[in-house]
A protein has these predicted regions:
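Conserved class I S-adenosyl-L-methionine
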Residues: 1-39, 43-52
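Class I SAM-dependent methyltransferase SAM/SAH-binding core
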Residues: 55-105
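A short acidic, Gly/Pro-enriched loop at the edge of an enzyme's catalytic core
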Residues: 107-117
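A short SAM/SAH-binding and catalytic strip from SAM-dependent methyltransferases
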Residues: 115-139
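A short glycine-rich, Lys/Arg-flanked "PGG" loop and its adjoining helix->strand segment in the class I
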Residues: 136-154
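Conserved beta-strand signature within the Rossmann-like core of class I S-adenosyl-L-methionine
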Residues: 155-162
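Core SAM-dependent methyltransferase catalytic element
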Residues: 194-217
Length: 217
């Protein structure tokens, strides 16, 4: 299980990027994420899945201040309140909707509303914290990715920022839990019903993966 310190929103703000991406790579990783995004305007609605304290959504709002709105999905109440405050300061409270929820648990989520879903170093850390085997982990990731797909309008895009396992870290399916490799992550996206899956940025184990909800789905 994750250390309880991660539940403290200020401690999380100080430590999350250093722990996940590393202080040397984090600025480039997140800058490249913003560069890979399509143009975002008043007709777009962004959903930040596992929003934490709103850092990733804040980068999007800074780059595209005219975006139509943001939904923040986060299970931790303190972090969600911090994220809401951050985004409201940039966009105004009327364009920010906080939703306290955990993906992968079959909860009630705002389906079919967003044009763009963003995920910032969420899936792999949660996967490690859940424990279980790699087989269990892949099944959970597919389930979560299917839920994220349901948040989007047909034709909407997902951009997922992750730190993945390297190919030589792969072990037995019934071995200790671990991060997915890039190939396993793209396979999970396809299994969850996504189209046009593509890695649009990679530096060693840092990746940004893009995928589309099929326009006809």
């Amino acid at each position: 299980m994750p250390h309880p310190y991660w539940e403290h929103r200020d401690w999380y703000d100080v430590h999350d990027n250093t722990s996940i991406a590393g202080p040397d790579r984090e600025p480039e990783h997140y800058r490249e994420f913003v560069i890979t995004l399509p143009p975002i305007g008043p007709g777009d609605h962004v959903v930040d899945v596992g929003a934490g304290t709103g850092k990733l959504a804040g980068l999007v709002a800074d780059a595209y201040p005219d975006l139509g709105g943001v939904t923040l999905i986060e299970p931790n109440e303190g972090k969600l309140d911090r994220a809401r405050s951050r985004l409201a300061a940039r966009l105004g409270p009327e364009r920010v909707r906080p939703v306290r929820a955990t993906l992968g648990e079959g909860g009630s989520l705002p389906a079919g509303e967003a044009t763009l879903a963003i995920v910032g170093s969420v899936l792999m850390p949660v996967l490690l914290g859940r424990g279980g085997t790699p087989r269990d982990g892949r099944a959970w990731v597919v389930r979560v990715l299917a839920e994220i797909r349901s948040l989007l309008r047909p034709g909407g895009w997902l951009f997922d920022v992750e730190t993945v396992a390297m190919p030589w870290d792969v072990g037995a399916d019934d071995g200790p839990g671990r991060r997915l490799t890039l190939l396993e992550l793209t396979a999970a996206l396809e299994a969850a019903g996504w189209d046009l899956v593509e890695c649009v940025y990679r530096f060693r184990d840092r990746v940004v993966v893009r995928a589309q909800r099929p326009p006809s789905s």
